[in-house]
A protein has these predicted regions:
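Short intracellular "coupling" helices and adjacent cytoplasmic loop segments at the cytosolic face
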Residues: 1-3, 90, 98-122, 126-128, ...
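Membrane-integrated ABC transporters
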Residues: 1-36, 51-63, 81-85, 89, ...
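Cytoplasmic coupling helices
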Residues: 2, 83-102, 140-147, 167-211, ...
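An intracellular "coupling" helix at the cytosolic face of ABC transporter transmembrane type-1 domains
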Residues: 12, 16-20, 109-110, 126-135, ...
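Transmembrane helix-loop-helix hairpins at lipid-water interfaces of multipass membrane proteins
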Residues: 22-77, 159-162, 274-277
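Hydrophobic alpha-helical transmembrane segments of ABC transporter permease domains
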Residues: 27, 31, 35-39, 125-170, ...
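Helix-loop-helix
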Residues: 49-65, 155-169, 243-312, 317-318
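ABC-type nucleotide-binding domain
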Residues: 333-581
């Protein structure tokens, strides 16, 4: 079944706090447009004076003064209307972006792995900016397009009802024909929004991956992918233009030729003495003014169709279910065990299980290792511990409390992750380690020393005040990893998870990090994920994953003695290590 498009009413729902300013702006715009009608009345009155041969200087100056005053007042009202609508639009844009970000901050972290940054960026900026543009400009034009033609039509009815009804003919044709010919335009706006997201994602990937692309001579292949995305985007844009060009052209022709309806009918009425010469000329002037205002309604209809896909994207995010926070809390100074009780998880409903019937018990303060081939489920297991996603069935507990029953802030305080891919802010090294905490510079330095990165930082001219990023220092993969470890040490959470924590470290630094971790992680429940099996020989418990299941667990010596999966992994690893040496 076709999904129902989000209506314009949702725009005003999003802008409900600004309805007062928007209403005032629209009201001022209506008065301003009504004043644009005054010059035509002035011309009409002057024509009457000329026809009646009652022209006097005071009368002419009086009507001229009225016309000038109306023009000045119209300019003032238009200015204030724009101030009201733009203020409301910018406030609404700010409020929507804050609300969307706040809402997204309550999602499971898996949402950000499932959605490309380009897709999120399109919704947060492009779609919301279109809403701002609509509120700032189209709301005023909409009020003018409805009220001004209506006022003119009522005036023309009082002047001559036959001429007024004749004016409806081009108006009806100008609406009906374009709407009938619009065809796939509404669907194309949805398609265009999707193509825009894909183009942003493709461009982001192409630029971000440029070093790897050049290293492996993939420039032509990856550029071809980007060019294909650009071609799809361009083709859709051309289809939209083709779909709207003919209807809009017909609307313009019909509405601009409205005078062809009023001229002959007005002439016929004049010859029959049913219409005065002054009224006849006034109708000719009003015809041009009437349909210029009315044409805005056709333009706004097109804009609303384009706005619809953006509204759909915003509403889709705002309607997404957030991660439910529990009510219980655990002290950050405690020491807790971790239990996976019959945990099963799949990324898509009905899809293959990424984890199946996983049972693990990790003792408080123990050093644990999750090992296994890529895709075995070890990273998924620790992500479920941090509630990147919630389990499909079973329970994960910290200190006997299910993670779903813990307050989300408390769960974050209890766990510290060292990710394989390190994200660094374009800020100083001090702030990158501090990460929003109130730690002193000395505490940051102690954490950096423990992570074996203090010597490098102090060797820089600005030390901890050195900035990272385009305008600052560039860090190697191993240095970035140690910054991440320093963050985890500074956080001092009772549970620490290292995902491929030493994958970027050379032998010397890896040894230093291992020594530091042995001293600093005492009393903490630690999970390490590593392919370098020699780094976890001293682990209290090694959990072996294969195809989403736990196939064995125990100490290094116990697993070697069993001669099973881990033993074969160890033999393969040692042979490869000796071969490399």
């Amino acid at each position: 079944m076709e999904q129902k498009r989000t209506g314009l009413s949702y725009v005003f729902t999003l802008a409900k706090e600004e309805r007062g300013k928007l209403s005032l702006g629209m009201l001022l715009a209506v008065f301003s447009s009504a004043l644009s009608f005054v010059p035509y009345l002035v011309v009409y009155q002057i024509l009457l004076l000329i026809i009646k041969q009652e022209v006097t200087l005071p009368a002419m100056l009086g009507w001229a003064g009225i016309g000038i005053a109306a023009a000045v007042l119209q300019a003032i009202l238009t200015s204030f209307a724009g101030i009201c609508s733009h203020t409301a639009a910018f406030n609404t844009m700010h409020r929507i972006k804050v609300r969307v970000l706040e809402h997204m901050s309550k999602f499971n972290l898996g949402f950000f792995q499932e959605h490309a940054p380009g897709q999120i960026k399109t919704t947060l900026f492009d779609d919301v900016d279109r809403i701002e543009t609509f509120l700032a400009h189209s709301t005023l034009e909409l009020a003018q397009a409805i009220v001004v033609p209506l006022m003119m039509f009522i005036f023309m009815l009082r002047l001559n009802w036959i001429m007024a009804l004749i004016m409806l003919v081009p108006m009806i044709l100008g609406i009906a024909i374009p709407m009938a010919l619009m065809g796939r335009y509404p669907d194309l706006t949805d398609e265009f929004a999707g193509d825009t997201e894909k183009l942003n994602a493709s461009a982001n990937e192409f630029i971000t991956a440029m070093p790897v692309i050049k290293m492996y001579h993939l420039t032509a292949e990856k550029f071809e992918q980007y060019r294909n995305s650009l071609k799809i985007y361009t083709d859709c844009w051309i289809k939209m233009c083709e779909s709207s060009c003919n209807p809009l052209s017909i609307a313009l022709v019909v509405l601009d030729s409205a005078i062809l309806f009023t001229l002959p009918v007005g002439g016929w009425l004049y010859l029959r003495d049913s219409l005065s010469a002054a009224s006849y000329l006034l109708f000719i002037l009003l015809t041009m003014c009437f349909f210029t205002s009315f044409l805005n309604m056709v333009t706004i209809a097109m804009q609303s169709m384009e706005l619809g896909s953006g509204l759909d994207n915003v509403k889709k995010i705002m309607d997404m279910e957030t991660m439910k926070s529990g009510q219980q809390t655990l002290s950050k100074t405690g020491c807790y065990g971790i239990d996976f009780d019959n945990v099963t998880f799949n990324y898509t409903q009905g899809g293959k299980d990424a984890l199946s019937d996983v049972d693990i018990h990790l003792e408080p303060g123990s050093l644990n290792a999750f090992v296994g081939p890529s895709g075995a489920g070890k990273t998924t297991a620790v992500q479920l511990l941090g509630r990147y996603w919630d389990v499909s069935s079973g329970t994960i507990k910290i200190g006997g409390v299910p993670v779903t029953e813990l307050q989300t802030e408390n769960l974050s305080d209890l766990t510290a992750f060292v990710f394989q891919d390190v994200f660094l802010l374009e800020d100083t090294l001090l702030e990158n380690i501090r990460m929003g905490t109130d730690a002193t510079e000395e505490q940051v330095r102690q954490a950096a020393k423990a992570a074996q990165i203090d010597d490098f930082i102090m060797s820089l001219p600005k030390g901890y005040a050195t900035r990272i990023g385009d305008e600052g220092v560039k860090l190697s993969g191993g240095q970035q990893q140690r910054i991440s470890i320093a963050r985890a040490i500074l956080k001092d959470a009772p549970i620490v998870i290292f995902d491929e924590a030493t994958s970027y470290s050379d032998i010397e630094n890896e040894h230093k990090i291992q020594l530091a971790l042995q001293n600093l992680l005492k009393g903490k429940t630690t999970i390490m994920i590593a392919h370098r099996l020699h780094t976890i020989r001293n682990a209290d418990n090694i959990v072996v994953f294969q195809d989403g299941k736990v196939v064995e667990q125990g100490t290094h010596d116990e697993l070697i003695a069993s001669g099973s999966t881990y033993s074969h992994m160890w033999d393969t690893y040692t042979r490869e290590t000796i071969g490399e040496e």
